């Protein structure tokens, strides 16, 4: 028992190591030159806008978190007859929520402090700019993995009870849903407003300082792709670790191991992934004429490879020679999903591949055919990723039952530090290009930042695929843990047959839950899509007003009111994220307590299956529309300004909320359902 608990300290140590490495990376970024006064001014405006949004978002969520904390303390205190137990559950929830918020702050601060420094570094060399942007992204990556592993390990060491700390994952999930949805609404409202009025109506280039929405657009890159994606993967990391620890107890008990060993092995996997990511960070570099994409790919591949080696060594140590190969195979199946989904996402969204090029060709006959082609590409893109995910589920289950499925998810998420680093590289590079344009640094610098931005677009698409795949496996791991934990509820014993739940697909209650789960996924997608439309309308009206009422703005003689546009996006995002958030949390609560365990189980299956398909479809359709436009802008099919290009801009505008708001909202929706069900299943009455 003591030896097993000692292993948890390795997780604690690795979490601390990740945070220390994040601080080292951040300090190295701050040592870089920020450039001239104009660059500093623009960077500061982006930083202030990003912080204003984050502060307002988290202040809005404080009352929600406190209410949930009180309900958890009272609910579990009453059920167990021990309010000390309820307090532990409530504290675990708050730790998860606070850790998620801290990761968001760390990443947002790093990326917004690095943008001008990346632009200035591009004056020296492409490699210098790559290093600054990647180190800034690394701060977010290490913060996500480090705070996640540190939080779970510390709570387990202190409370010594996995069931008590389930709520850590729910705390992370609750914050992640609002961060993902709010961030997606913010970034797309600003993006659509900047593009439609600036590029289409006014005919000015992207990132032109005359565009009133240009600062809000650059803030949005960080809000959506840094804070939003980071919160999403922090949620997956925490939830998967918790589910794997819970299932590890049962696996160890059934196979003659110490229960603590089964629970602490996922912490060791997380530690292995962090060490692998730190080592791989030093492999990311390129030459002046080199390929930045290859440099980042080497970082990802080496992280996967080193994690796999560490996994076998740890599995051999913890489980011995009989089980080590199967445990290793389960974990590696997750690593394979990581690589496979990334490659598939790149294929369906890259402007160098047939799907996006076919959408571009369809644009020659107008916006309608562009939209039809994009929808078809998105739908077609679902089947191969699903086959990959299903294969990992089967391999994981064959290897170690439900514990194997959770370990497959852990294998995928063990590399989260590097994946988040590579994803957060994108907004830094995008902002760096915007600053180069607004500070009028000339085409040579802009060409370098554009090269990094193009890589950032690809890594963002790959990271979206990773987020979807990890969310799917996380949801399944949570589902497995939920059914395992349900066996401990005396009120649900009547559904057990030979130690397993008898839940037939033809049972009306299960079917009701299935349909409700699928419906909620579509409803959240609709609400978030409408939210972008409403927020974008406000932004478009404001940008038009400024062009109309500010004398000399179009001629570049007057300065736009950037702060007004930032304020509009912030207010709209905070206001519009509340309804989808309440639905995501309220649906499983209502179904569980009104319709019962069978319906809640069906709901989890329905929201997961529908959510995964919607997420893949929307993310890939949006990415393909975006890159079809870029393919035309590269000089193909008439190039910029042609009717074909205008049709592609319409498709890209439709695709924006697909890939950056509604699609990504499915990830936390699935996980919120799973983590909340895990919390309430001991309290269900029937």
UniProtKB/Swiss-Prot annotation:
Catalytic reaction equation(s): diphosphate + H2O + H(+)(in) = 2 phosphate + 2 H(+)(out)
UniProt-listed GO biological process terms: sodium ion transport
Molecular-function annotations in GO: diphosphate hydrolysis-driven proton transmembrane transporter activity; inorganic diphosphate phosphatase activity; magnesium ion binding; potassium ion binding
InterPro entries in alphabetical order: PPase-energised_H-pump (IPR004131)
Domain of life: Bacteria
Important for ion transport, annotated site positions: 180, 225, 232, 660, 671
Annotated residues for binding of Mg(2+) 2: 218, 221, 430
Record entry for activity regulation: Requires K(+) for maximal activity.
Assembly and interaction partners: Homodimer.
Name this polypeptide is given: K(+)-stimulated pyrophosphate-energized proton pump
Organism from which the protein derives: Carboxydothermus hydrogenoformans (strain ATCC BAA-161 / DSM 6008 / Z-2901)
Gene: hppA
């Amino acid at each position: 028992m003591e030896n097993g608990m000692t292993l948890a300290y390795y997780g604690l140590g690795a979490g601390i190591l990740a945070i220390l490495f994040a601080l080292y990376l951040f300090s190295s970024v701050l040592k870089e030159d920020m450039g001239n006064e104009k660059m500093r001014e623009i960077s500061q405006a982006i930083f202030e806008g990003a912080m204003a949004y984050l502060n307002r978002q988290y202040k809005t969520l404080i009352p929600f978190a406190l209410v949930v904390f009180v309900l958890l303390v009272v609910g579990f205190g009453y059920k167990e007859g021990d309010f000390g137990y309820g307090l532990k559950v409530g504290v675990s929830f708050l730790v998860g929520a606070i850790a998620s918020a801290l990761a968001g702050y760390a990443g947002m601060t790093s990326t917004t402090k690095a943008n001008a420094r990346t632009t200035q570094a591009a004056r020296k060399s492409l490699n210098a700019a790559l290093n600054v942007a990647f180190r800034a992204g690394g701060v977010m990556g290490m913060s996500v993995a480090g705070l996640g592993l540190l939080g779970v390990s510390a709570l387990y060491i202190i409370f010594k009870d996995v069931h008590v700390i389930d709520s850590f994952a729910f705390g992370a999930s609750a914050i992640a849903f609002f961060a993902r949805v709010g961030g997606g609404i913010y970034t797309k409202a600003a993006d659509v407003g900047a593009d439609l009025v600036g590029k289409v109506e006014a005919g000015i280039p992207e990132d032109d300082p005359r565009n009133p929405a240009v600062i809000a657009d650059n803030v949005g890159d960080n809000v959506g792709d840094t804070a939003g994606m980071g919160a999403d993967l922090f949620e997956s990391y925490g939830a998967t670790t918790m589910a794997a620890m819970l299932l590890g107890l049962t696996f160890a008990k059934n196979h003659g191991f110490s229960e603590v060993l089964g629970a602490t092995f996922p912490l060791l996997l997380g530690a292995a992934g962090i060490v692998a990511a730190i080592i791989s960070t030093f492999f990311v570099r390129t030459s002046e004429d080199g390929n930045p994409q290859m440099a980042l790919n080497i970082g990802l591949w080496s992280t996967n490879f080193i994690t796999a080696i560490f996994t076998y060594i740890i599995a051999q140590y913890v489980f011995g020679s009989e089980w080590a190969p199967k445990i290793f195979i389960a974990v590696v199946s997750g690593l394979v999903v990581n690589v496979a989904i990334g490659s598939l996402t790149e294929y369906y969204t890259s402007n160098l591949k047939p799907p996006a090029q076919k959408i571009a060709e369809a644009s020659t006959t107008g916006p309608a055919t562009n939209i039809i082609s994009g929808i078809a590409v998105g739908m077609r893109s679902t089947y191969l990723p699903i086959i990959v995910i299903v294969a990992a589920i089967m391999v994981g289950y064959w290897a170690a039952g439900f514990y194997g499925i959770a370990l497959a998810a852990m294998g995928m998420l063990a590399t989260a530090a590097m994946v988040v680093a590579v994803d957060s590289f994108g907004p830094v590079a995008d902002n760096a290009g915007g600053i180069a344009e607004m500070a009028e640094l000339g085409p040579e610098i802009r060409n370098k930042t554009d090269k990094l931005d193009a890589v950032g677009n690809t890594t963002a698409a790959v990271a979206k695929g990773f987020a979807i795949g990890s969310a799917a496996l996380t949801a399944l791991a949570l589902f497995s843990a939920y059914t395992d934990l349900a066996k401990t509820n005396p009120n649900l014993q009547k559904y057990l047959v030979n130690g397993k739940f008898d839940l037939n697909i033809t049972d009306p209650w299960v079917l009701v839950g299935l349909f409700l789960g699928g419906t909620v996924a579509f409803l959240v997608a609709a609400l978030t899509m409408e939210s972008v439309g409403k927020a974008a309308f406000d932004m478009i009206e404001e940008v038009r007003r400024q062009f109309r009422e500010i004398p000399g703005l179009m001629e570049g003689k007057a300065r736009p009111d950037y702060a007004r546009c930032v304020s509009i996006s912030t207010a709209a995002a905070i206001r519009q994220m509340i309804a989808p958030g309440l639905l995501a949390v309220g649906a499983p609560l209502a179904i569980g307590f009104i319709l019962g365990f069978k319906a809640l189980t069906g709901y989890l299956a329905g929201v997961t299956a529908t959510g995964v398909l919607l997420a893949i479809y929307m993310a890939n359709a949006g990415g393909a529309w975006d890159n079809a436009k870029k393919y035309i802008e590269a000089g193909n099919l008439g190039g910029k300004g042609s009717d074909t290009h205008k049709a592609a801009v319409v498709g890209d505008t439709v695709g924006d909320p697909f890939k950056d708001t509604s699609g990504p909202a499915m990830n936390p929706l699935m996980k919120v359902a799973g983590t909340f069900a895990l919390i309430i299943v001991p309290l269900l009455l029937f």
